[in-house]
Structures are given as structure tokens and as C-alpha cells.
Design a protein with these regions (language model features):
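ATP/NTP phosphate-donor binding region
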Residues: 1-89, 344
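A glycine/threonine-rich phosphate-anchoring loop and its flanking beta-alpha core
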Residues: 10, 20, 111-208, 302, ...
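Short alpha-helical scaffolding segments that buttress acidic/His motifs in well-ordered protein cores
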Residues: 196-200, 240-251, 288, 331, ...
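Active-site segments that bind and position negatively charged phosphate/pyrophosphate groups
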Residues: 202-330
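C-terminal charged capping/lid subdomain of soluble metabolic enzymes
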Residues: 304, 311-388
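Glycine/serine-rich anion-binding loops at beta->alpha junctions
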Residues: 87-103, 138-144, 275-278
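Short Gly/Thr/Asp-enriched flexible loops that form oxyanion-binding sites at enzyme active sites
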Residues: 77-79, 98-112, 146-147
Length: 388
């Protein structure tokens, strides 16, 4: 187990009616608020109206229309609004895309230059200050409500990058599972795949992290149990609550404690999203089983067989390779149960850009020097071809 620092400074208000806690929680941070929302779902389901009512004593400025795979163009608009209106705090009302956009705006206000350069250089210290960010979560998926990451896309350059800074961690997050009752089944499925991927990206590694791995397995089993329930009974409170809480703990640093983590599937999927603007969780559901098959070997066998036994209940008396293969098949079957696509070709994607995507992923991320299984450009291209 490697050394680590673990800190989660987000104050979470979890449960029914917790929106009532927002005014008191936010007031010390400021009263001039930029409210960031998506493309209309929070208007249709009435959540935005409830937020405005709760914050009737605050000065609200709205920025709507954040896309899935949030664009740097929207970040630029938000930065201009904040400077023009003297915004003191940013409130994201939505899912991960909205929260990520809000985080980028919060840091962009203090960045001297184009926000896209800030995104590209976040690991080099480009983020030195940020407005406080609060969230009202409406989708269990990315875990952005409790972490210091934001993923931003540039459609002009076909690029999608993660910006990282502890300054981006939300100060307050309102997490009412009832606010996810209206999430359609396809989005619930994609969000659940995203949660699972966040756990698996750090689970698969060489470190002897017994406790952390058992926590990861419990979180995975939670998603596996409750995602189908939430899809068939969208107003099942316990299902929505468990998915929401699992989403936060999947990526707030707990499951990565003491581990070196590679995020290979995310790096590959970011190329797909950048080129084809597909739903992030859908891309991960297609890529992950094929990545697993590609890297299964003597070195990785023990972890894959443990995954099969402890998460999927595969018979431990079987040969380890058989256990591992069945575990991968069970994951694939679970994604089918959620009615997620399992081939890129079903999304109209062919291999014409694969070599370019693979080269870009290898050049701009740490995938080529990953601590678990390094992937060359050719390996990435081969995995993408396996996904067709």
C-alpha cells in the first residue's frame, strides 16, 4: 500500500428535503450566485423552481444549456458572466456535466488567458484560485459532487481533457435521491456504468490493498444490485439513494487510497467522446470488457479472478483463467441487462479515426506508462477494433 493523503472537504446534505439546508449552508460563501443548469430537465421536473424558491434572498444569475460532455465555449460564457455580475459563488443544479462546467468556470474567473489553456495545464499549476462551488445533484454518475476533477471538451479540436485541483472540490452538495426519480432509464444505465468504471479503474492494480479492495467490491455490488431496480422502478427511494451515495464514494479518493491508478478505459473513452460526442457511460460500457480481455494475462490473473469471485460469485474451484473469463462475461451481461450498447458499430462508429485517437491518447495521457498494464498506441487501436 502506497502512502496517501485523504481529505473530503465537501459538506454533504443527504436525504429527503435537504434542499432546505442550502440557504444556510451557502450564505457564508456569498449571496451573488451563478446558477448553472443543463438543457432543460431541471425546468421540466420542477427542481430548478424549488432551488430558486429556496434561494429567494440571494441574487441569482442563470447560465443554462450545458451540454453532456460540457464545452469550453460554455465555460467561456460563464467566466464572462461571473466577471460582469461580480459572482461570489457558483451553484450547479444538475449532473456531472453541469458540475464539471461550473468547476471550470469557477477556476476560469481567476485565470489570465483562455480557459482551454487552463484545462490543458491544470496539472502544471494553472489553477491557483477558484470561486466556491456548490451542487444540487440530479443524476448519480460522475461523482463530481465530491471530487476535484472536471472534464471539459473542445469540439473545435476534437479533444476532451480532465482538469484536476483540490480547489475544484465542491464546498456543499445537496443530495436528495428524490431529485433523481425523473432520470430516464437510459441515463440511469449509463450513469451506473460510469460509477462502476470509476471503481474498476482503481480496483485493478498490483498493490496489496486488502481493505480498499473489499470496499470497492462492496460498492460494485451495490451498483449491480440497485441499477436494475432504479430502471424498472424509477421512484424506488432506496435504489436511487444507494446509487447516489455509491456514485460519490466511487471517486472521492477512498477507493484509490494507497493505490496507483491508471484510468486507461477513461482515457480511451475520452477520445471517443471527443470525436463522436457519445454518452460517456455508454462508451465505458463498450470499452471496459474488451480492455479486460486484452490485458488478461498471468500478471493480471489474480485480480481478475478475485473480481469474478468476490463481485459476481463465480465458483472459486474453477481454474483461475476460467474464473476471470466468466467474470468479464458477467460484467458484459450486466451491461446488456441495462440495455446498454455493446458495440461501437451500433452507434455508427467505424475505425477510420482509431489510429489518430490511439496516438492522441498515448501522447497526451499517462496510458503508455500505466503502472498496471501500459498500452502502446497500437494496443489502444487494437482495443478499439475489438469494440466494433
Amino acid at each position: 500500500m502506497h502512502n496517501f493523503i485523504f481529505s473530503v472537504p465537501t459538506t454533504v446534505y443527504f436525504g429527503k428535503g435537504q434542499l432546505a439546508s442550502l440557504p444556510k449552508a451557502m450564505h457564508p460563501l456569498g449571496t451573488k450566485v451563478l446558477v448553472v443548469t443543463g438543457r432543460g430537465s431541471t425546468i421540466r421536473n420542477g427542481i430548478l423552481a424549488k432551488v430558486k424558491c429556496a434561494l429567494s434572498d440571494f441574487q441569482l444569475t442563470e447560465l443554462s444549456g450545458v451540454d453532456p460532455n460540457p464545452r469550453v465555449t460554455t465555460v467561456r460564457k460563464g467566466v464572462e458572466l461571473c466577471r460582469e455580475k461580480g459572482i461570489e459563488v457558483i451553484l450547479a443544479v444538475g449532473g456531472g456535466s453541469v458540475i464539471d462546467c461550473a468547476k471550470a468556470i469557477a477556476a476560469g474567473v481567476y485565470y489570465d488567458g483562455d480557459p482551454w489553456n487552463m484545462v490543458l495545464d491544470s496539472t502544471k499549476g494553472s489553477i491557483t484560485k477558484a470561486l466556491p462551488v456548490c451542487t444540487v445533484l440530479t443524476l448519480a454518475a460522475t461523482g463530481s459532487e465530491m471530487d476535484g476533477a472536471a472534464v471539459i471538451s473542445n469540439v473545435d479540436t476534437n479533444e476532451k481533457f480532465t482538469m484536476l485541483s483540490p480547489l475544484l472540490i465542491p464546498k456543499v452538495s445537496i443530495m436528495d435521491p428524490e431529485f433523481t426519480f425523473s432520470v430516464p432509464a437510459p441515463q440511469t444505465a449509463a450513469g451506473s456504468a460510469d460509477i462502476l468504471s470509476h471503481i474498476m479503474e482503481v480496483y485493478f492494480g498490483d498493490e496489496n490493498t486488502y481493505m480498499t479492495d473489499r470496499i470497492s467490491e462492496a460498492l460494485m455490488k451495490t451498483v449491480i444490485r440497485f441499477a436494475p431496480v432504479a430502471m424498472t422502478r424509477p421512484d424506488d427511494y432506496e435504489a436511487r439513494a444507494n446509487l447516489m451515495w455509491a456514485s460519490s464514494w466511487a471517486i472521492n479518493g477512498l477507493t484509490a487510497a494507497g493505490k496507483a491508478h491508471d484510468w486507461s478505459c477513461h482515457y480511451i473513452e475520452h477520445e471517443l467522446s471527443a470525436f463522436y460526442d457519445i454518452t460517456h457511460g455508454v462508451g465505458l460500457a463498450i470499452i471496459t470488457p474488451q480492455w479486460m480481455r486484452y490485458i488478461l494475462n498471468e500478471k493480471t490473473l489474480d485480480k481478475f479472478s478475485a473480481f469474478a469471485r468476490n463481485v459476481w460469485g463465480i465458483d472459486g474451484s474453477l481454474p483461475k483463467y476460467e474464473q476471470a473469463k466468466r467474470g468479464i462475461e458477467e460484467l458484459e451481461n450486466f451491461f446488456r441487462l441495462l440495455k446498454l450498447p455493446n458495440k461501437l458499430s451500433s452507434l455508427g462508429i467505424d475505425d477510420r479515426h482509431f489510429a489518430e485517437m490511439a496516438e492522441h491518447a498515448n501522447k497526451t495521457t499517462g496510458i503508455g506508462s500505466a503502472s498496471y498494464v501500459p498500452l502502446s498506441s497500437k494496443s489502444i487501436e487494437n482495443i478499439l477494433k475489438m469494440c466494433l
